[in-house]
Amino acid sequence: MLFRSAVNLRPNLINVVPNRAVFTVDLRNTDEAKLKDAEARVAAHIAEVAASERVGVEARSLARFEPVIFDAALVGRVEHHARALDLSTRRMPSGAGHDAQMMQRLCPTAMIFVPSVAGLSHNVKEHTEAADLVAGAQVLMNLMVELAEG
């Protein structure tokens, strides 16, 4: 289960007790049942804390998509083309709501990830070396040529 959150206090001042707090939660999992269970547990915990602290809570979903599994054959072809270039491969789940997640419902889909320095992703310090970007683009081009040639 991947979990990310943020808290925004209003007013956000050192010496003032806030009168409003906005808490966002981003839950991700490749297993729909586990995702639903986590959502229910978070909602129950928030309701319990709100009742014990006698505060009001408003909860709403900003976005919700069922997890998808990418096309196994296409993922295998991505791995084949990476290995042909002596590149390492690793299968990684991603619940970030990429376009590929939406397209998988319509057609076979896969994603190609390239390494970020220090593993930082979706972070202001994220950086990927040019050579890794070129390698990822080469894998994509080789796959596209293969698919175009049928």
Which positions does each model-derived feature cover?
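Short, small-residue-biased leader/transition segments that mark boundaries at the very start
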Residues: M1-L2
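His/Asp/Glu-rich mid-to-C-terminal helical/loop segments that flank catalytic regions of hydrolases
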Residues: E39-A44, V114-G150
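Solvent-exposed, non-transmembrane alpha-helical starts
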Residues: K34-A38
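Short beta-alpha connecting loops at secondary-structure transitions
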Residues: L9, R28-E32, L62-E66, G119-A131
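Active-site-adjacent substrate-binding region
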Residues: G56, R60-P115
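Short beta-strand/turn micro-motifs at beta-sheet edges
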Residues: R10-N15
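Generic non-transmembrane alpha-helical segments
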Residues: R41-E53, R77-L85, V139-L147
